[in-house]
């Protein structure tokens, strides 16, 4: 059982068969748990659709609605730290609604990319190429598990820090269980909230990790393609026609990678744009909660884990997009420095065509406005400092406590 769950986290032996689909193994397992990948059987599909409706209703409808209703009905009962902790999640939930709906509705794109890019697996023939491929499969699955641990770690820390403080973690509106009536009610309401928020968090995980999974696949196959290009016309036993066929195969594989990048481009543009809009606001609220209001070591840990989770939502994807541009440049450089000088005319014509195509790097943009890069991620994160400066200059924290002490805000 342990081997079944964790075998993809270790690099497979070079003599073992590995496919591109294996790189998204854990991603699709989480998708199956959330109800996003229905089975093929008709009866099972109907039963499974009920679970899909349940998770979608809890994560996309009830979670943001429950937080908003709590502000309307029980706003006077929030402490500043509780309010900011809940508000962070509420704002993130609004972004999660957009990202999750887009990702769920575009799951067909992932299946299409898997079908296309799987045709490149048979190109991994040398030991070096298989080593690159096997390491990538293990690394991508490990990243998905690390994301899952980080996201659920935030939920876990928030749950226990709040319960030990005698409060419900997010104080979702719950007409069935009032956590203020007793110890057992507190635990029941808190566990229910934890389940709802965990589902919403995993839905956001699906929106945040698909780019890492597939861009890593693109990078891996570009690295293998670069190795194949460097070895073109190095075998004296092959004829010029066979060398030409190898060049044509490289051109076709590069075209397949470009086609996959075009498939993922629309969904990546929307989800990363939505994430960029949320990063600065969420980081600003978390920093305000830590800097301007009383906290225990546990609430600080919960806020820090939230900051880590927010940063991991966009930073790895931005970094991979930059590396993908560099990989495209490396492919064109490898082609230019390959052994084509003494080739025949048809081979040189293919080289010129391929060189023209390879010099156009694979780039992605967020909302068709700004490039997806580390620099863009840092730029939107700087908005957090703007929020902190506004709160500091207007002394909002001191005014809040002053109003409470004067009785203007009744708890």
Swiss-Prot record:
Record's bilayer topology term: Multi-pass membrane protein
GO biological process terms, semicolon-separated: detection of chemical stimulus involved in sensory perception of smell; sensory perception of smell; signal transduction
GO molecular function: odorant binding; olfactory receptor activity
Stored InterPro entries: 7tm6_olfct_rcpt (IPR004117)
Cytoplasmic-facing ranges: 1-46, 108-139, 207-271, 318-369
Function: Odorant receptor which mediates acceptance or avoidance behavior, depending on its substrates. The odorant receptor repertoire encodes a large collection of odor stimuli that vary widely in identity, intensity, and duration. May form a complex with Orco to form odorant-sensing units, providing sensitive and prolonged odorant signaling and calcium permeability.
Protein name as it appears in the record: Putative odorant receptor 59c
Organism in which the protein naturally occurs: Drosophila melanogaster (Fruit fly)
Lineage: Eukaryota, Metazoa, Ecdysozoa, Arthropoda, Hexapoda
